[in-house]
Amino acid sequence: MVEMKFAVRPERETPSPPAPPAGYDEPKLFEYPTLVLLLVSVPLFLLTAYGFGWLLWQIQGPEVFATLFAVTETGDSTVLVLDMIDVGLPFVVALFVTVAVHELLHGAVMRYYGQDVTYGVNLAMGAFYAAAFGQFQRREQLFPIGLAPLVSIAIGATPLLAVPVPSIAVTAYMVLVINTTGAVGDLYVVWCLRRMPEGTLMYDVDLRHMYVFEPLDVEV
């Protein structure tokens, strides 16, 4: 008789949060609804692309899009051909610069509040990040931390739509679309924070595990 043994790889345990501070309830795991956020990001992208595209059209006129499309007239028809080289390079630049600046702005506000910031890239998740691991963050601080990139980049990039250099204006348009769409997770956190009591604390154990500590003396 041949005895066969199979080694079962143990499941990865969820990292434990610290003990609750005095006056706080037991921690609750905070999770992002990944599928919901992905679905929400689609109409957000379309709305943002149309909105900023309309603004760019109003400021620059239709000729600005000549940097994106090659126009060919054949008989009674006009054919628009997307130039992938002229579009692809500004898009890649806009993507990486926007993501990097987005996270640097998160980190800058964290540092303003005296938190130690860790920057990094998680290839498995396909994400850049700025995080204050192993530190309590107050609910009131997380509002500016979460909204700083969305607001700052919008303020900085929107005026560039009026620059009379099509490549700059179009790149600014891409930055605005990428940044706004990519802020869907930040907007979700802010929406959740609005429903939490004042004084709530959040604690990042690692990139995937965030815990919420709510105060015990909450008035109903």
Question: Model segments located where?
Answer:
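Generic, low-specificity signal for short hydrophobic/alpha-helical stretches with a mild N-terminal bias
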Residues: 74, 79, 86-87, 129, ...
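Perimembrane loop-to-helix junctions flanking transmembrane segments
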Residues: 62-83
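Active-site recognition of the HExxH zinc-binding catalytic motif
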Residues: 98-115, 149
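Metalloprotease/metallohydrolase-associated module, dominated by Zn2+-dependent proteases
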Residues: 2-60, 125-220
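Membrane-water interface of transmembrane alpha-helices
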Residues: 108-121, 191-194
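Short juxtamembrane and helix-loop transition motifs at transmembrane-helix boundaries
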Residues: 81-84, 106-114, 131-139
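Short pre-active-site segment immediately N-terminal to the catalytic Zn-binding motif
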Residues: 81-100
